[in-house]
Structures are given as structure tokens and as C-alpha cells.
Regions:
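Extended hydrophobic/aromatic segments used for targeting, binding, or gating
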Residues: 222-256, 260-261, 351-361
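An anion/phosphate-binding loop that grips the pyrophosphate of nucleotide cofactors and donors
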Residues: 60, 362, 469
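His/Asp/Glu-enriched, well-ordered alpha-helical/loop segment
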Residues: 303-312, 320-323, 327-343, 348, ...
Length: 521
């Protein structure tokens, strides 16, 4: 049924139009403008009042399978001491029969002891079951003795293996995560995924770009996320990036894009002090972090993927990794020029000046995570302690935008929770004030730019005639608010294809639809 929305309509289009009327019918936008044509006058009308209508939000980088798993499990981010963390583990263990206790969010910065929990402490908290606690940044974990006993011998030979403390970094962490994800049952996985989509919808998301490929047998996680993308009956959109440098896997899945973190991560992260830097860490002159791949390996991958017409995204946190990503994409485009490739560098937390110039010249886009700028699990004081004055160059949003680089907003969930309002707030309140974005620019990170990033802007991302009526109603008008007030925004309704989002899709319904041919993912 046709419906009219009257009030503040923020289009988030290229010209930042704000209109008075929007007419929706059968899931599409028929009209947007300031005068309501006579042909639509008789349709039912919703007067927004102080509320505002915008495009639904998109999250351009999250580890959806991991987010779904930990979203339904043990979250230790609220612990303020190690005894409290142990109590949380014990409580969860009493209430759940899981053979492996999986948790997320350990941080040295939020507990009084200012260190990670140890293997011995995990042993005392949970002596009878294996425990696997992922660090807040998603790049390390702590395990107990029972978990160590379960791991295959090949994991114990990898870089980052520390049996004495139970902390696993670099390749040892990735291999441990691969091993554990194989233990999660398929029905539980599907239930967790459906619940996670419902939780994202509550925050106003109607699209996500998920990076997949974390060690499930036969890449089952990728297959399941593809089924999810096709099987959701609400109209929620999912675009899958397969984290692999093995393009045979991409061909078999017939995906138009490749990359993410894990196998396509070029370095580590600041929290583990293994993000690859051009100059040593301020607190350790012997440490410049780690590049996981040689230049030759990355160039071979990007050239091959670019020749096949794939969209490429790679994780790079430090400036050395950022430069490696730029160099490899430039080499690929010199080898096989493409006008509208939309290759991207995920995070780009500490970009170099020359690398940004290349991004602007080559059309390299950056899916970044504004919430990192106000992350209590990785506070600014810590970043200054390891980077010195370089901390002031993290995520220079204003500079990148003024250079013409397309930025989009994501969460890197489960590292931060999917929350577009928090991301918009952070982008407008950078701790270096001159690097903040305007409110319209910040809104676009999670709307138009999010859709553009995966070639979806012709159908989604802005409220324009002919596009899908994927929309959110906010309680207030962000354009009349001050940047420091933006956390007062609340999502009241998510509308996909013009209809209110409905929670609780069943497993059988998802599989029945998701296994059919067709559908865009």
C-alpha cells in the first residue's frame, strides 16, 4: 500500500538534499520532494513531527560469524578486575553446558591489574572445561591448559605460541581460532546468526559487509553467510568478502569480491603491538610490528584478483602495512587498468601522507571504524604510549575526505558492537578536533558511502526516486543537533522494502530460501 512520509526527509544523496515529502509504494520510493503531487494526496500519511527519516544504515566491515558467536556467548568487556572477569567465566560456565567456553573482550586497559588474565587464572576459574577468551581487538586470545591440550601439534610450532602464559598471537592465534570454530554445531551457528541480524536491525542496519573465512571445515562459514544473505526474508542485505588469497575458492563461490582480515590481513593491531610501522614503537625501539606477507606475495594476489575483475579489500593498521597495500593495488592497476574497481584498504588507522595521495589518485576507498576513536578498551593514553605523537595522525577523517577519498563506516564487530549512532558521534568528535567530519558527512559514512562501497548505490544508500525504500526513523533531526549531542539519537523504526522489520525468522525458512539459486550477496 502506498504511504506518504511528511516531515524532515534527509536523503543522504550526493547533494545532501533535505525534503518534506517521501512517497513509498511496493517497497520502492515513488517520489521525494518539497511539494506533494496531487496524485498522491489521498494516500495514508505518517507525520514525522520532531522525528526524521533517513536511509537505513550499513556496516562496511564486520566479522559477522564471530560477532554472531560471541553475541550469544560470554562477553567480558564489562569486567573491571581480573577476579570479576573470573566470576563472569564461572557464572557463564554454571549456566551453559558448552564443552569449550568461548568469550570475548579481554583488555589490559579496563581492569585494575592492567594486564591480561593468565592461563593459570583461567585454570583456577574453570578447571574442568576448555576456555578460549579472545582479546578485545580480535587479534589475540588467552586459553587455559585444557584448551592447550586439545590443540593440534602444528599450532604449537607457529609464531605467537605462548604456552606458558596461554596468550596466542599472530599465526598461532589464527590457527587456534580456526580449530575452535570447527567445534561449533551448525544449528547453533544458524540460530546465532539470525539473532545477530535481529540485533543489528534494532540499531537501524539494513546492510552489512561481512568478512568470512575463519577456519570452518570446507569453508562452511562462507557458505552459511552466503545462504544467510539470500535467505533473509526481511530484505536485510549482506555482502560477503571471502578472506583468502586462494582465488580458486572465490571462483567456486562465484563471488565478485575478495579480502578482509585473517588471510588477507597485512599486519596485526595496536593492542598487540604488532601493527606494522615504518618507525619503531615508542615504547620499544626493537619493535616495528609484523608484516604477515612479503611484497611479492601481496602483489601476486592483487594482480591476479584485479585481472579477474574482483573487488579487493585488505586489512592494514600501521603505516608500513598501509603503504604495502597501496603499493600492491597500484601494481595491480598498472598491470591491468580498471576505471571503477573500488578496491579498499580496511582500517587504514595510521596512513602515510604519500599513501593517501596514491589512494586519491587511484580511487582506493577506505572502510574505517570511527568508534575506534573513542574506544575505552584501547584508550588514547595507550596509543600515545606506544606511538608517541603518531597517535595524533590516527584516522585523519577530515584530511582524507578533503582529498576526495571515499570513506565508509563499520564496526569491525565483535571488536566494537555494530552501532551507527556511536560511529557517527565519533566521526564528528575526533580527539583531534580539526579532523572531525560534519554531521552530513558522518551520516554518509553509514548510508550512501556504505552502499557505494559494494556497488549498491543505484538501489540503496540514499532516499531518491526509484530506489529501495530501506529507511530508518530517528527520534530527532541530527542536522539540528550539536556534534556532542549526537548520542541522543535513537533508532525508532527500521523499514526494509517499506515494511517494518520483523524479528524472529526461523531456521527452516532461512534455509529454504537461502538454498535457492539467485539473489545478490
Amino acid at each position: 500500500m502506498m504511504k506518504i512520509y511528511e516531515g524532515t526527509i534527509i536523503s543522504c544523496d550526493r547533494e545532501n538534499h533535505v525534503n518534506r515529502y517521501l512517497v513509498e509504494d511496493k517497497g520502492r520510493i515513488l517520489y521525494v520532494g518539497d511539494e506533494l503531487p496531487a496524485a498522491y494526496q489521498g494516500a495514508p500519511r505518517e507525520v514525522l513531527g520532531e522525528r526524521t527519516l533517513l536511509p537505513c544504515f550499513g556496516d562496511t566491515h564486520l566479522h559477522f560469524m564471530s560477532y554472531a558467536l560471541f553475541n550469544a556467548g560470554l562477553d567480558v568487556r564489562s569486567a573491571r578486575s581480573l577476579p570479576e572477569l573470573c566470576e563472569q567465566i564461572q557464572k557463564f560456565t554454571r549456566e551453559n553446558n558448552d564443552k569449550i567456553i568461548m568469550g570475548f573482550g579481554a583488555s589490559t586497559h579496563c581492569v585494575a591489574e592492567k594486564r591480561l588474565i593468565s592461563k593459570d587464572e583461567l585454570d583456577r576459574a574453570c578447571p574442568d572445561r576448555a576456555v578460549f577468551i579472545v582479546k578485545y581487538d580480535g587479534h589475540a586470545c588467552i586459553v587455559n591448559s585444557r584448551m592447550i591440550a586439545m590443540l593440534p601439534d602444528k599450532v604449537k610450532t607457529l609464531r605467537g605460541w605462548h604456552a606458558d602464559t596461554g596468550e596466542m598471537n599472530q599465526e598461532a592465534f589464527f590457527a587456534t581460532a580456526d580449530f575452535i570454530t570447527k567445534k561449533v554445531s551448525l544449528p547453533r551457528t544458524i540460530r546465532n546468526m539470525l539473532r545477530a541480524v535481529d540485533d543489528m536491525a534494532e540499531k537501524g542496519f539494513g546492510m552489512m559487509h561481512t568478512v568470512s573465512g575463519v577456519g570452518f571445515p570446507l569453508d562452511l562459514d562462507v557458505a552459511m553467510e552466503m545462504i544467510l544473505g539470500k535467505g533473509l526474508d526481511s530484505g536485510f542485505q549482506s555482502r560477503v568478502f571471502f578472506q583468502t588469497m586462494n582465488l580458486d575458492k572465490i571462483r567456486k563461490k562465484k563471488l565478485p569480491r575478495v579480502g578482509g582480515c585473517f588471510a588477507t590481513a597485512l599486519d596485526g593491531c595496536f593492542g598487540s603491538e604488532d601493527a606494522a610501522l615504518r618507525q619503531p614503537y615508542a615504547n620499544n625501539p626493537q619493535n616495528r610490528g609484523i608484516l604477515f606477507h612479503s611484497n611479492e606475495e601481496v602483489i601476486h594476489f592483487t594482480k591476479q584478483a584485479n585481472r579477474e575483475g574482483l573487488q579487493i579489500e585488505m586489512h592494514a593498521i600501521g603505516d608500513a602495512a598501509f603503504n604495502q597495500a597501496v603499493m600492491a593495488i597500484e601494481a595491480a592497476l598498472e598491470d591491468c587498468p580498471r576505471e571503477d574497481h573500488r578496491h579498499g584498504i580496511i582500517h587504514a588507522c595510521l596512513p602515510s601522507e604519500e599513501g593517501l595521495q596514491k589512494c586519491a589518485e587511484l580511487g582506493i576507498q577506505i572502510p574505517l571504524q570511527p568508534a575506534f576513536l573513542m574506544w575505552n578498551l584501547e584508550p588514547l593514553e595507550f596509543l600515545y604510549s606506544i606511538l608517541g605523537d603518531r597517535a595524533e595522525r590516527i584516522s585523519p577523517l577530515r584530511k582524507m575526505t578533503d582529498m576526495g577519498i571515499v570513506l565508509s563506516g563499520g564496526s569491525d564487530a565483535p571488536c566494537t558492537l555494530p552501532d551507527p549512532i556511536a560511529g557517527i558521534y565519533a566521526a564528528c568528535n575526533h580527539y583531534i578536533p580539526e579532523q572531525s567530519l560534519t554531521i552530513p558527512e558522518a551520516l554518509k559514512l553509514f548510508t550512501f558511502n556504505a552502499a557505494w562501497t559494494t556497488f549498491d548505490e543505484k538501489e540503496r544508500g540514499s532516499l531518491e526516486t526509484g530506489k529501495m525504500a530501506d529507511m530508518v526513523i530517528l527520534n530527532r533531526n541530527p542536522l539540528t543537533m550539536k556534534p556532542n549531542e549526537l548520542l541522543g539519537l535513537k533508532v525508532e523504526h527500521l523499514l526494509l522494502k517499506g515494511e517494518p522489520y520483523k524479528k524472529g525468522q526461523g531456521m527452516l525458512s532461512l534455509l529454504a530460501k537461502g538454498l535457492l539459486p539467485g539473489g545478490r550477496i
